[in-house]
């Protein structure tokens, strides 16, 4: 996706923003970064201004008190001055508290978030949801192992993803190798542009990601330094908004301006320079075939387009999907499961006619309302707001129906998993974030203790990827539309005069020729008009990263009329890309909760996972250690297994209340307690309510609720209630 990358994988859009330098554009200047003015909250701005004034007043009054004491002024005069100083200090303290409250409530405060995150992570590691890889050898940053409950949740998430997308939409699933030849990633742009900017400690050589150091500095200043002026705070927020687009020179200038040093040693830092994030390898024993561990799964789908198109009966639209591992050699991994060096992606490439991006099932999602964050709201400093998806498409906020359809389907997928819909938003990419070939891009962002985390990218990438691989491989990756009757069409013909271009540009001739031939019709006709009126034109060649002067004798541009029996075109691609690890971590945070024990002397942790994704659907507890009850538990276990319900029997002598608490902490939604040889109770985790059912009914009831055929409310209304006040004690 571009995604991602902030988490495990860097935002793919950022990758492809860089990719745009390889493609041509006409009569455009090289990309320049205009500051995006993000208006500061009016209350925060007012409080910062007030605090600055109060600080000045306190300082001035303090000087006045010292001057009175130095001049041996009368005691009443000194006392009055001290009283005024104390009054000013109290006013300053009040403003500081108000400002700190505003910062915390706006999501910038870190103390509560850090405490919550620590509680979640401690529970996850203690219950073996995940653990650092190779822990007995001190581990390696950015590598984690999923333990038994973590594996179960991941399996359930991917199973539902297949059902929700691949089966529902009749997608074609593929499984491509992780090891990818260099030529493939050269064509896609990854070899040249899949980079982050890195700095080194000039004395120890320790590496850091440059933008992270700048982000940490700005964030800490905004959160903890209440003395900075409103103007300085606005400047820092502007830097946070645009720093992903900083060039190495701009980023280095900011690091020097703010005096940022190595976090561990306070040593000076080197200038930022690009570091390619792919793991390089060689294929075969000769070492002559260079390759990389794939940074995304999408390229495997693109290079197989021709075969998939034929497999689908040469019909559009169709979608191909892939679930698999991807790799990113992070400079300084942090944020736990959110930024790792190996991760699971689930990606969809939906191929569609660029002249018809309607979707037959759009009406199924058109009435959905959820938080959306269009670029206009971002630019004006507003917040995300609830919009009707159908209206957003109709007004052009979302570019087309197919893109809108997948946004709606992603929303349904995430909320069914257990993501809180009030902490889920769809943010549209700003103009400076998008590659020039992209029609529209949205990210599904989930709020966590780390802030808003990009977990799914949904992008209309036009025809860029298929064209790039067509050009590099020489294999046309195109689709056809046959006409019932021949049509007379006008075709754009661009003919570079290679002799003249060779004389003018010598070794750069090939770059200029490719750029001229890659122009779209609008760009070509604009060039033609300028050449006819002025005889020359400035033409920006992305692969050279500079403009060149094109004269009238260097290129011929015309339109010819032809009769055609079919239309051959390169399909556009709508691409939803899912960072599975990020989604799962955000799910952990959204489902984590605490509640007091019966005695009220401690807080008990629990995960409120929906049955759909819970690692274990049900536990079976004999109420007491009793051979008869244990035999009944084994019978129920067999019945649960026969209907495909994951479960666990606990026949330890521990009290039933402690066993409930233990499984609540794993997020198990249901517990069957055996206290008879004819009937049992079923306990629901969140409410702690219990019903009594017969032995024969137990497995079918748990199965029906786990699979969504019934709700717990249905069960509660159907079966006798059971009360056991002591059970949870």
Curated annotation (Swiss-Prot):
Q: Which SMART domains match?
A: WHEP-TRS (SM00991)
Q: What is its main location?
A: mitochondrion
CDD domains, from UniProt? GlyRS-like_core (cd00774), GlyRS_anticodon (cd00858)
Q: Where is the transit peptide?
A: 1-28
Q: Can the keyword Cytoplasm be found in this entry's annotation? A: yes
The record's annotation in Pfam families points to:
HGTP_anticodon, tRNA-synt_2b, WHEP-TRS
The family classification in the record reads: Belongs to the class-II aminoacyl-tRNA synthetase family.
**The WHEP-TRS domain, residue ranges:** 50-106
User: Record-annotated residues binding glycine?
Assistant: 296, 347, 575-577
Amino-acid positions noted as binding ATP in the UniProt annotation, renumbered to this chain: 328-330, 339-340, 454-455, 582
Protein location: Mitochondrion; Cytoplasm, Cytosol
Q: Which reaction does it catalyse?
A: tRNA(Gly) + glycine + ATP = glycyl-tRNA(Gly) + AMP + diphosphate; 2 ATP + H(+) = P(1),P(4)-bis(5'-adenosyl) tetraphosphate + diphosphate
- Function, as annotated: Catalyzes the ATP-dependent ligation of glycine to the 3'-end of its cognate tRNA, via the formation of an aminoacyl-adenylate intermediate (Gly-AMP). Also produces diadenosine tetraphosphate (Ap4A), a universal pleiotropic signaling molecule needed for cell regulation pathways, by direct condensation of 2 ATPs. Thereby, may play a special role in Ap4A homeostasis.
> What is the protein name stated in its UniProt record?
Glycine--tRNA ligase, mitochondrial 1
Q: What GO molecular function terms would the record report?
A: ATP binding; ATP:ATP adenylyltransferase activity; glycine-tRNA ligase activity; protein dimerization activity
Q: Which organism is it from?
A: Arabidopsis thaliana (Mouse-ear cress)
What does the annotation say about its assembly with partners? Homodimer.
